[in-house]
Swiss-Prot record:
Annotated GO CC locations: plasma membrane; proton-transporting ATP synthase complex
Keywords (A to Z) from UniProt: ATP synthesis, Cell inner membrane, Cell membrane, CF(1), Hydrogen ion transport, Ion transport, Membrane, Transport
PANTHER family the record matches: ATP SYNTHASE DELTA CHAIN
Subunit structure: F-type ATPases have 2 components, F(1) - the catalytic core - and F(0) - the membrane proton channel. F(1) has five subunits: alpha(3), beta(3), gamma(1), delta(1), epsilon(1). F(0) has three main subunits: a(1), b(2) and c(10-14). The alpha and beta chains form an alternating ring which encloses part of the gamma chain. F(1) is attached to F(0) by a central stalk formed by the gamma and epsilon chains, while a peripheral stalk is formed by the delta and b chains.
Protein localization: Cell inner membrane
Designated name of the protein: ATP synthase subunit delta
InterPro entries reported in the protein's UniProt record: ATP_synth_OSCP/delta_N_sf, ATPase_OSCP/d_CS, ATPase_OSCP/dsu
Lineage top rank: taxon: Bacteria
Entry's Gene Ontology molecular function annotations: proton-transporting ATP synthase activity, rotational mechanism
Stated family: Belongs to the ATPase delta chain family.
Taxonomic path: Bacteria, Pseudomonadati, Pseudomonadota, Alphaproteobacteria, Sphingomonadales
Keyword Mitochondrion appears in the UniProt entry: no
Primary localization class, coarse: membrane
The organism of origin for this protein: Novosphingobium aromaticivorans (strain ATCC 700278 / DSM 12444 / CCUG 56034 / CIP 105152 / NBRC 16084 / F199)
Amino acid sequence: MEISSGITASLSGRYASALFDLANDQGFVSAVEGDLEKLDAALRESADLKGLINNPQLGRDEAGRAMDAVAGLLGLGELTKKFVGVLAANRRLSALPDVIRAFGQIAAAQRGEVSAEVTSAHALDDAQVAALTEKLKARTGKSIKLKTSVDPEILGGLVVKIGSQMIDSSIRTRLNSLAQAMKA
């Protein structure tokens, strides 16, 4: 399988690639991807969980037990649970968010999709998401998997990230550019 060397060159990319290969061999790619999405949501919502994975004072066994409990609460599959245990045993839990992102990119590339992250000041409705997905599909020529988030600090407009490309049409960026131009 051909994977971007940029993804696999990083530590998190190597872990994600290994997990993808295991999941692919066992036919669990979509199940593992769903598990990782649950974990990602839990990491975004829980400051305690985020603190747990970034705590360097936590021992391997403690981290493993804590993550096993989290995996049980989230209903994660056996492969994902074992993988998170390996990260805990290797003291690499802090890489988990990057591993999740890299796994998603690898899985999307395998399906011929491109992942796009869209940040807006307000939640987008279904029609806006559909229209944006179509525009991005026309621009890239590939199927788009859209992940949306809300950041009121951008004031308005959108910030779209597709792979290493970023399209920033936020009002905050425009105001910052105007302020810089006025200083010059």
